[in-house]
Amino acid sequence: MSRNKIVLPLLASTLLLGVSVSRAQAPTDAYRNSMRKTYGTARAQGMSNAVGALGADPTAVSVNPAGIGLYRSSEVTFGFNVGHVKSSTNWQDKEGSDMSKWVGNLDHLSIIFPISNPYLVTSDWRVVMGASMSSLYDYDRDYEMRSVAPEYSLSEYIANKATLIGAPYNTLRNMSSSPYFLGTMAYNGGFIETRPGYDDVYVPSTYAAINPFAPDKYAESNVTYLKPDAGRLNVSEKGSRKMYDFTIGGSWADKVYFGATLRTTSSAYARSSMYREDFHYTYKPNYNVENQVYYTELGNSLTVAGGTVGASFGLMAAVGDFGRIGISYNTPQFGRYNEVFSTTIQWYNNNRTNGKGELEPLYTNGTDDMTNTYNLMLPGDLTASAMVFLGGYGMVTYDFNWRDLGSARLQGGDFRDANQFLKEDYGSQMTHRVGLEIRPVSGFYLRAGYSYSDGGLKSEGIRPQEGNVMAYDYIASGAITDAVLRDSYQSISAGVGCRLFGRTTLDLAYVRGKASERVFPFPGAGEVKDQSSGQVVAPGISSEGAAMSTVTNRMVASLTFRF
């Protein structure tokens, strides 16, 4: 039987989105390694990273390498942070959930030193080198999404995709030959089965006989497919992405500054998730039959380790005695990642209980740990910066950053669909940062800052919809069907700095960051029709998601020794 997907709100290019094999990557893998937050020294974070034209700060140098040319002496900086992360979800204004945890680490270390004598009046040139490590992004958080009577189930989504593939059940149930890993897991785990009279059309296994005493109890005309009474998604994420910079730069006549950076990153990420749906069917009283009770569980575990390499270039110029302007470019980052993952599916109904009357799984299907390696190109970005002096009492700074998230690319396999999704559905992401530093008295500084980034979502299909209902078919990452779409990130910060003794300084900052996101338990899908008859063999579905905000409150401290 040949089939085609009837595309309703979906793009034609998403024909096979979501139909993934066990080792498939998805746009979520690219986006996860592109996520940002306020980072670096306490001085920079106190100004919300609006430091591209500031210079003479290790994080300012990471934004614009030309800033290294302002250094006249050597310095070593250590940075620490401790914070609280809280994720809150709201499903259809009916069901909410909060989860939180404490985090903290050594998040910055740098050394910078001139390699030419900055005090030689016979030369207008200065050359400076430096190296730094910064925690670029922390993944640590837990979140939970609860739904009440969602319109569609995960089993319906998987049945739709298995039908679109059109693989006979003898092929689908064989892990070694199946073209659809999640469908194989679901078929062997009791989530889906073949529709009566077909061997390649699939339906959910969560159904009940309308008349339990009918001669053909499970004839299609006597079966009702159940909708979930409730859904619950639990996710725990851990890990971080760190950045290592090796910079050389300098200045000419204290008017023009230049620099270049070799940049590497390392990433360690771990994720565990469980999505459960509960079903219930009440028979008519005259049947005197026990009610039908089901629940299904899809569990996934994923760990990823890898890194990238790239470069950064910057220029900066003094504008008289008024301030400075600068521009910098980060090249695309090229990376390689290794992952280990496993999946478990369990299907329960009240035909099996233990001695305590608790439901036990009637079907269980799980995998051993599986491994995979893939390559990834992350987008480059451009930053324009400006700084204006406030007499001798401080400065105001502004940074504008632009990058094209749609230029990210998965490599090392057949990622045509995923890369097409990235190209068509992600686009320009813009970040605005503004900072203030004032010096009321010598040796003491007050700082404040604000930053805002949009989510870089281009397609209407993945942009916010009324009620957080999404019919769009984004790509599931293997058996991980849930995904988070970020709409914005903003931070507000305040800080102080003071001279402790000699040329040693202490900087402190408070940073409040908020990520506004939407979380979905599975994608939407278009209906599937038999090409020859035009009969709908799998209905289209939508996914009902929840609004989620992740708020991080952090205290940052940096200690700098100059010599």
Report the location of each language-model feature:
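Bacterial Sec-dependent N-terminal signal peptides
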Residues: 1-28
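Hydrophobic alpha-helical membrane context
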Residues: 16-17, 69, 76, 519
